[in-house]
Regions:
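C-terminal SET catalytic tail plus cysteine-rich post-SET Zn-binding segment of SAM-dependent SET-domain
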Residues: 15, 24, 144-145, 152, ...
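Eukaryotic beta-rich interaction modules
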Residues: 19-31, 39-46, 79, 186-208, ...
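Ankyrin-repeat-protein effector appendages
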Residues: 140-198, 206
Length: 546
């Protein structure tokens, strides 16, 4: 890494000695992984090298061509090393500029091509990264690093395939017990578009029919912050929030594209007049040319409003954290996922894997239907409770479930009596029986039954989980399978629905189940975890059936 030694020449001795000293210091800092400090020293070395090359090539009446050549080679290497340090700090735009400047000096410089390929990978530019690694193979040094280069090439091909097809599979990672680092994933956008939402500002909408479990999008975080809250939860959260704001601010400063994507997010005000962006600007390959250091700073007040409205907690009611990060409290900003609005009839869930949010359909979605998730618990939550939770989030839900229950609540005294009975602690069996008999009298049919069963899921769960209550009420109420089907049909797959079925299977015949029961559980599992778990054994492991 240190490059060639400079010969010492009479009046040039001072600057050349300084260059040698700067290069040694920068190399030492790079090896010690002190990225910021190494960047500072490399910058001094680069500026002085350019000054010396300019002086030797211009005003010097007797330039030394060998010295100029050595200076240029050292400058190329210094730019490459500074790019490497910048990439470690995720300053990919500046790193790319350094790589391009180094390649202007030596277009086939192996180390720079390798570095540029890795930077392009960091920018989710898989095809361009592959071309870099292919060019690097032409260098004689590639023979000593063949395994490394071919490894990167295979990664590019795998990620490019994921980005184009949405063919992700986490099965092997799951079966390993989440050993090692989280898998590196590609960014992916499925059959969706951004449109004006009838319920709240802008939203994501399906452009084709989407089957339950199908990937909708995979997106990398602008920034995340994680930690263990412990006993001082509130104080720890405030520290995390401060760090998170600083990380987002830094990311916005480093890249025009990030600045643009964060700037168009909602601040919670003037929702009706917000720009409707084209989905293509969220594709890394489409927007790459707009990258560069942001000359504009995002107004602090606006940024805080954006983060307040759009930040996502990883371990949320509609999300599941996979791998080692599930041990931590985490918050992050995923720009495209921020367009997903709330509904009490959600059709999407997300998984968090490393820095990525993976959004999939939790039930079948029709073309033209809005992609929604639950911001709060919509099971065991009657209308009034959901209204309170929506208010705490700062909005009023106008989904079809809320409209249906509002009408029923206004016109039916029995519903109000039922809720008062639940508050007094009425027997779960009685409560379920009252709901089921009431639906017959109120002429509630089809999917609407699932809406009310979801609202009073707590008492259904209690009765189906109790052998004593089932002996008493089992013949008077619908079977567990019927109720689970009707609830999942309207609210999507939920961990509690799966758990009930799994526990029931474990009670029967020592955990043996028939094909129909197993397929029902696996179908719910697909809606909960998505089709990123293709191996049956991996899904059964997640469901606690292995």
């Amino acid at each position: 890494m240190g490059g060639e030694q400079f010969e010492q020449h009479d009046d040039r001795e001072g600057p050349l000695e300084l260059l040698q000293s700067l290069r040694s210091k920068a190399t030492e800092l790079l090896l010690r992984e002190e990225w910021e400090e190494s960047i500072q020293v490399y910058t001094k070395f680069i500026d002085l090298s350019r000054s010396q090359i300019s002086k030797l090539g211009g005003s010097d009446p007797d330039p030394d061509p060998d010295l100029i050549h050595k200076l240029r080679k050292s400058l190329c290497l210094a730019l490459c090393n500074r790019a490497e340090a910048r990439a470690k700090l995720r300053d990919f735009v500046e790193a790319m500029m350094d790589c391009d400047q180094a390649l202007e000096i030596e277009s086939t410089h192996f180390k720079t091509l390798l570095c540029k390929g890795k930077v392009l990978l960091g920018l989710s530019k898989y095809a361009s990264a592959l071309e870099c690694f292919k060019t690097a193979l032409l260098d004689p040094q590639a023979s000593d690093n063949l395994e490394t280069v071919t490894g990167y090439m295979e990664k590019c091909k795998r990620l490019e395939l994921q980005a184009k097809t949405g063919a992700f599979d986490l099965s092997d990672w799951i079966l390993s017990g989440f050993r090692g680092r989280s898998p590196e994933l590609a960014e992916f956008i499925g059959s969706i578009e951004i449109k004006k939402s009838e319920t709240s500002g802008r939203g994501l909408f399906a452009t084709k029919n989407i089957v339950a479990g199908t990937l909708i999008l995979v997106t990398k975080a602008v920034a995340t912050e994680r930690g263990i809250l412990g006993t001082g939860g509130e104080k720890a959260q405030l520290i995390m929030w401060k760090n998170f704001i600083e990380e987002v601010t830094e990311s916005v400063k480093k890249c025009n594209r990030t600045h643009r994507l964060v700037s168009i997010l909602s601040t919670g005000h003037d929702e009706d007049n917000l720009e409707i962006p084209d989905i293509s600007i969220f594709r890394p390959d489409e927007a790459f040319e707009t990258c560069g250091n942001s000359k504009q700073s995002l107004d602090t007040e606006k940024l805080l409003s954006i983060l307040d409205v759009n930040s996502l907690v990883e371990d949320a009611v509609s999300a599941k954290v996979m791998g080692k990060n599930k041990e931590y409290y985490g918050v992050g900003l995923w720009t495209l996922a921020s367009f997903i609005n709330h509904s009490c009839l959600p059709n999407a869930r997300r998984l968090h894997v490393g820095e990525y949010a993976i959004v999939h359909a939790s039930r079948d979605i029709k073309a033209g239907e809005e992609i929604t998730s639950a911001y709060f618990d919509v099971l065991s939550s009657p209308l009034e409770k959901r209204k309170e939770m929506a208010e705490s989030w700062g909005f009023c839900c106008g989904c079809s479930r809320c409209k249906f229950e509002s009408l029923l609540y206004v016109t039916n005294q029995e519903i109000r009596e039922l809720e008062m009975g639940l508050e007094r602690g009425v027997d779960a069996g009685n409560a379920v029986y009252m709901v089921e008999e009431g639906m017959k009298r109120w002429k509630v049919k089809g999917k609407d039954k699932g809406l009310l069963r979801a609202s009073y899921w707590g008492v259904y769960d209690e009765i189906y989980s109790s052998e004593r209550l089932m002996r008493r009420w089992g013949r008077k109420i619908p079977t567990m399978e019927v109720v689970v089907d009707s609830v999942s049909d309207v609210t999507g797959s939920d961990e509690r629905l799966m758990k009930l079925l799994v526990e029931d299977v474990k009670k029967k015949n020592g955990g043996c189940s028939n094909i129909t029961e197993m397929e029902k559980i696996l179908k719910l599992g697909k809606g909960f975890y998505g089709k990123v778990v293709s191996k049956r054994k991996a899904m059964k492991t997640l469901l606690g059936l292995e």
